[in-house]
Structure formats: structure tokens, C-alpha cells
Amino acid sequence: MCGLCTSRVVPVPPPLCPRCGLTRVIPGPAPGECADCHSWAPSLRRAASACLHVGPAADLVRGFKYRGWTGLTDFMGDRMLPAALRLAAGRAPILVPVPLARARRRERGFNQADLLARALSRRTNWPVEPLLRRERGGPSLARLGRRERERVAEHAYSLDPTSLPAVDPHSQLLIVDDVITTGATAVACAEA
């Protein structure tokens, strides 16, 4: 990454919503949330983003995800670290990567969320546990609107029963993904 591109990765500007971590443009009906996250399920308590998904950051994510630019993993992990530390709030959570459908993982050769979770783990010593599995494939959410994303993501994830014995039920879980837009994937994972 050149210095110019790095300088153009835009942090999420304040004021931040304390729940979804995005710029709070329109207040929500309840204190502590904005109009974007007020409909999230209670199981998804908070979220955070490393940066705005615009300009070079959006190009990097697309290259990482769709062109196999996995050499960006550490750069992206560095950018995600402050947001992850804010969410952890002094605790050591278990990092849970969002799983890909089998066909998509086979096609890409990697799961970008797993790579990012492992990059965060190298920086924090927090454990990574693949607690979720993708129940079914489906269309990519990248070009879908809010309602379509919610419909596709609903019931798409479940707990992987083989992973459960390794986890204390009182553990804090931090779901890791490359992008958060509407929160549909994060909500579906938290509900699993």
C-alpha cells in the first residue's frame, strides 16, 4: 500500500452511533441507537467499522474479496484493530468469522472473514473459533437492498455443534466480517 492510498482510507466520521458504530445521521426511536440499527435483533448488541467503504477502502475490499489480494490481510487487520478493541471493551472475546457457503469458498479458495479474524488474533492473542456454519448458499448480498439482504441472510447461519464444547457460554463473541452495510449478516449470525 502506498502512502497516498493509505491516507485516503477514510475513518468513520463522528458522531458515531453507540450501537452500530456508523455515523449517526438520523437518531433512532430509542436512546443509544440510530435509525439504521434500531430494528436490529437484541442479540447483536454493538458493531463497529474500521473505515468507510468508499474510495480506496472499497477498492481494497473488492480486490481482497474477489481478486484474491490476500496480501492485504495484515493491512486490513491493522485498520480493524481499533474498532475491535472498542467492541471488546477490555475483555478478550472469541473471534467468530462469518462463514461462506461451500461453493463460494471453493470458488475463492479462502474465506476473507476467517483471514481477517486470524489477523486480529495475531494482534490481540484472542482465540478464533469457527462457531457458525452457512446453511445454504444464495445470491451475493453486495448488490441487494436492505429488505432483500435481510430476507437472504435470515436463517442462513447456524451454530456448528462440533465447536460448542470449546466455548464457555458466558464468553463474549465478536463476529468478524469484511464489510457491514445494513447489518443483516451480523444480525443473522448473532441470532444463530
Regions found by a protein language model. Give the residues of each.
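Glycine-rich phosphate/pyrophosphate-handling loop used in enzymes and phosphotransfer proteins
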Residues: 1-192
